UniProtKB/Swiss-Prot annotation:
Statement: the UniProt record of this protein carries the keyword Isomerase: no
Key words, A-Z: Hydrolase
Pfam families reported in the protein's UniProt record: Acylphosphatase
InterPro entries tied to this protein: Acylphosphatase, Acylphosphatase-like_dom, Acylphosphatase-like_dom_sf, Acylphosphatase_CS
Catalytic residues of the enzyme: 20, 38
UniProt cross-references to SUPFAM superfamilies, sorted A to Z: Acylphosphatase/BLUF domain-like (SSF54975)
Name assigned to this protein: Acylphosphatase
EC number in record: 3.6.1.7
Amino acid sequence: MEKVRLTAFVHGHVQGVGFRWWTTSQAQELKLAGSASNLSDGRVCVVAEGPQTQCEELLRRLKENPSSYRRPGHVDTVIEQWGEPRDVEGFVER
C-alpha cells in the first residue's frame, strides 16, 4: 500500500476547543504518524503520513460538516497538500 504525506490547513474556530486533541485521537485510530499544530493566524496545521486510504479518511473527518465524529469547534475550510512521506513516527500535538 502506497504511503503518502497529507498536510491540511484547517480554517475556522479550531483553537482552544480541543481540536488538536481530537485530531490526534483520530489519527492514532487510523494508525497515522504526524502532528497537529496551532498556527499564529488561528489555523491548525495537520500533517499525517501513512497509507493513502487512511490519510483520505482523516481528511474526510476533518472536512465533514456536521461532524459525525463529535469534532470540537467549527471547520470552515480545509486546504490540503499531498506529498512524499518523510517517515515520521507517532502522532503528536504541538
